[in-house]
Amino acid sequence: MGADRRRHAEHVMGTVVSFDVPARAGDPRGDGPLGRAVRWLHWVDATFSPYRDDSDVSRFGRGEVPLEQCVPELAEVLEACAAVSTRSGGYFTTTPGGRFDPSGYVKGWAVERAAGILTAAGPAGHSVNGGGDVQCSGDRMWRIGIADPLHPGRLALVVTGRDFAVATSGVAERREHIIDPYTGQPPAGLASITVVGARLAETDAYATAAFAMGTAARDWVEGLDGYEAFAITGSGTTWQTSGFDRYLD
């Protein structure tokens, strides 16, 4: 890492969010773009965590406050979640196991917005990685390793690209919010699925929905404009959508 770059890892939202940014983005505890992005993530954690009794998500989920008395970003998230649920035929849900929890959308949305704070301030060529789900910005060519869920410590492949988002759902991640809504059980068929798109909020949510679909995911992702996918099945076989090759070396 040269003097013109800065890397920072922030423990927040139950995961580690890693930044790779130009040095001019500033200090993570300062008032510059990096500091503002870090503070945004902690605000999201305090506001949207279903594990904090005093968060807006928890209070709304318990019926203690109406949506109108919550932060406006909650309505924004719920509208986006409803759209993904419709597009996925109900495989994406904010009530896994019957409990209100929009985490399947919030993390990708929060990381994408953090990257947007950096972009708006001018430092081009950065990545924000939230527990393996990544928003990359600028003209720099990025290489993102995809873990092999059946062989811990190994990579299944490396995807490359510019100004794109990569999200993976699977058995290797902490994915307790992924439930097949039609069976009420954890989904079967896939060990992991990686989705590549332009914006992490939707890319991450689509990866969640696709993992819940299991074997039906391939045809579904093929029908999404601007998205590609690579999957590893429970037996170790792999498949990819028709345009995924563009992201491989």
What are these regions (language model features)?
Residues 1-249:
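Mature catalytic core of soluble alpha/beta enzymes
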